[in-house]
Amino acid sequence: MEFSAKWITGPAAVDRDSEVAPYFFRKQVTLPENVEHAVIYATALGIYNIFLDHEKISDSYFAPGYTEYNNRLQYQEYDVSSLLKEKNRFVLTAELADGWYTGRLGLCNKENCYGKKRALLAELHLTLSDGSKQIIGTDASFEITTDGPRRHASFFDGEEYDARINIDNASFVNVTEYTGTVPPALVPMQGVPVRLHEQLKPKRIFQDRDGITLIDFGRNMAGIVKIGPFTAKEGQKVVIRHGELIQNDKLYTGNLRTAKQTLTYTCKEGVNEYLPEFCYMGFQYISVEGMEVSEENICAYEIYSDMESIGSFHCSDERINQLQRNIVTSLKANFVDIPTDCPQRDERCGWTGDIAAFAPTAAFNMDITTFMKKWLADLALVQKEVGVVPWICPSNNFINDRTSNFWAQNFDQCDALWGDAATLVPWAVYQSSGDISVLEQQYQSMKAWVETEKRLADIAENDSPRYIWKHGMQLGDWLAPGKDMNDWTDCAKWTSTAYYAHSAQIVSKTAAILGKTEDAATYDALFHTVCQAFRDTFVEPDGHITDGFQSIYALALRFDLLLPEQRPRALRDLLDDIRTRGNHLGTGFVGTAELLAALSDEGKVQEAYDLLFQDTCPSWLYPVQCGATSSWERWDSLLPDGTINQSDDGPQDMVSFNHYAYGAVGNWLYTRIGGLSLVEPGYKTFRLAPAIGEQLTFAEVSHKCPYGTITCRWEKDALAEHGYTLKFHVPEQTRAIVTCPDGIQREYTSGDYVLS
């Protein structure tokens, strides 16, 4: 679509009067007679809401969304026909806050990363009964003020709202045309809107040691708090602070870094009600000062991109069920227009490594196809700009600012797993959805990433052989327990070479699917060459990996880096390491997703169960034992004595309690315990083969694939040792390959089945 309207903004005087208050635009509109259809198209430098006579036209949040603004900006389309019925005059208004464009962004902790001025572009398209059309667009006839009730709005810091202010009585001035830089491409909405979802009532209302009211909403989340209706005096001030934990009988906010996560509401006389519009917080607990709270006048809403829930998992052990709930909670909390690392501190960036590890788990639980295709398109754009896949996407404009800090200075460094998001994420989306367009969209990006890995692995450094990637800054086995940052990065030559091989294999498979036979052969040969180099460099003939560690053993087994005769020794070494640690895992971000499958797929199902059911630190169930309601960034974010981990083994204050990377274990819950794994993309053909361990008596899984909902439940037979009953449903147009209770593999077409 081509806009004929003008970009509008505030004059310099408006910005001087209030650098932090949202812009508020308005225009009186007189409608022609016989309007049959009305549509608003809108976008902004910032984040906006549009109103007709003070009625918000959409329930979405944070439009136009976060894209790589150096390259493109989304616009939205709203059908407002029903809102204009019976109207001949109305006030068209828009509120515009900083958002990602001019607001403070993570890692750099700077404002105005993409630009210094907010601006709005909008058109109202009217279709009359005679078929004629009229367009009313933003232009010099609009007015602007910053004297509205919302005095401040920031993703990290929250909002300040003064209910005593009536916007209709504010002092408006004429807008000015915005003539600055705008993103070169305006594109229709590519992703899915962010919306409010589950409402949470207080689970507990209590006081801290100073008598300040605290509220526990029962689980960690990304969301906002609504207050009201409640009666107050004019000028009464309500202050709400958000945090993930209570420590020493006080709300803990130390891990927020510089983010304030605070709502300040100044009351009008009488009945008050308030819901923020331009921020969200990461929290389970809040402190409230300035009002009497009850279950009736305060609640919280989870906020995340509007994706359909398509997967479920349940079993006989409530701790594992809580682990699954934690996985889904952190998925939702960190899918707020882009896949972020965390929803609470002053970061909230699109970290590529986190989603690379977590994508298969995410794709099972939610329909992430549209969400991820939008983000992947930006990944390809950033990759093209800087020549590599960076640590974060969108870039926070580090492309044009390399001086802010360590992350900006090293933005164009290449990193295994983080960079491999270019291959792993589109592959996971394609496998789950069967949507080949994601591979078509991303193929050049996928191929370019493997070529980058190839170039870096060919750099001779300290006499390293070809195809072994040792060059450059690497995060390595990030956050592996019992180690520090130097240890994590020292693991990189093993893990980066492993992911290099894996990505080459994915590109080969992708090329074959897309009919690019020459590329398929080229990258298949590269995969085998890198595997050979890995074995020649790191692996002894019997399969022992020199200076091996859990993550590299897991990757070597899962990525087929070893010869068949080497696998038994590698498996034995992995098991020995686990036993040496007292049946504890030792993996960081790069290996955790593959660890249990490396055991169970080599026949060590019970050993995998034993590791999953470990409940002392480090383990998946340790946070559950501590009462966690979301996935943690570190295995030991909370120490056994109940205090926050304040260690200095990484970036300062890096302790999030809502971080999905280690939740990647979910994929093993669904595919091995639940037994459901795909054979063909989109589950056109799927496998049902539960891996049954002694700790569970039943497990059930369901997944809504493009053809219908697959269900599978197994339950042990109390009367027969090793016996169990298998109930499953095969949707129309699909085929199931089932490992039956008698151990024989059979195929089933659509229908419901019970096997014993």
Give residue ranges: language-model regions:
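Extracellular/oxidizing-compartment recognition motifs
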Residues: M1-R345, G353-D354, I368-K373, V386-P394, ...
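Non-catalytic C-terminal accessory modules of carbohydrate-active enzymes
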Residues: N112, K116-A119, E123, I136-N166, ...
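Alpha-helical support elements that line or immediately flank enzyme active sites
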Residues: V39-A42, I224-H242, F278, D354-V382, ...
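Active-site acid/base region of carbohydrate-active enzymes
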Residues: I47, D139-S141, T145-T146, E295-N326, ...
